[in-house]
């Protein structure tokens, strides 16, 4: 079909703003559960630290985080505050791949999707007093799901990302 596809990649908060300004027809984002998407799947998260250069035992705990208003940042900081652990930002990036690599190489502890776990990571959890965070999903939004081209693209994304129709 004759379609122009413009792809925008960015932090969830930036994509949401573009969606609200009606600059996007289709949006695939990670989000906390809440707003009902066209299709979605749970996004399991893991607390990750470096296996070779563990950081969780440090005081303050160095953290690997998205920038302000980035995903998982609030969950990480609130959890450590609740545990009475002091922390500092060891590395910040808007890139999921960069965060995963930085954590694996010992720059700090992070909370990322399970799919970002690298062989150089160790998974943290109950033994460290860290809770399971299961409140996020990968969500697909479509402005006009009954429009043929948008529907075709949405169906392709549902298949590609292993989403489930809502």
Indicate where each model-derived feature is located.
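Hydrophobic hinge/microswitch elements
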Residues: 11-12, 71, 77, 83-131
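Secondary-structure junction motif
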Residues: 55, 62-83, 150-151
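Central regulatory/effector-binding core of bacterial HTH transcription factors
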Residues: 1-32
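Flexible hinge/capping segments at coil-to-helix
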Residues: 35-68
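Short secondary-structure boundary segments
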Residues: 31-32, 51, 113-116
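Ligand-binding "clamshell"
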Residues: 23, 33-48, 119-129
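Residues at or immediately flanking beta-strands
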Residues: 2-6, 86-90, 137
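A late-sequence structural motif
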Residues: 129-166
């Amino acid at each position: 079909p004759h379609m122009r596809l413009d792809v925008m990649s960015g932090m969830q908060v930036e994509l949401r703003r573009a969606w609200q300004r009606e600059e996007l027809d289709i949006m695939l984002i990670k989000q906390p559960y809440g707003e009902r998407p066209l299709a979605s799947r749970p996004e399991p998260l893991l607390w990750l630290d470096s296996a070779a250069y563990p950081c969780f035992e440090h005081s303050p705990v160095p953290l690997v985080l998205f920038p302000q208003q980035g995903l998982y940042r609030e969950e990480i900081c609130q959890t450590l505050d609740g545990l009475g652990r002091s922390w500092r930002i060891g590395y910040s990036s808007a890139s999921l791949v960069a965060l995963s690599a930085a954590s694996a190489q010992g720059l700090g502890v992070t909370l990322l999707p399970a799919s970002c776990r690298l062989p150089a990571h160790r998974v943290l959890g109950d033994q460290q007093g860290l809770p399971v965070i299961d409140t996020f999903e990968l969500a697909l939004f479509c402005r006009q799901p009954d429009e043929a081209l948008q529907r075709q693209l949405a169906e392709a994304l549902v298949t590609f990302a292993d989403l489930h129709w809502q």
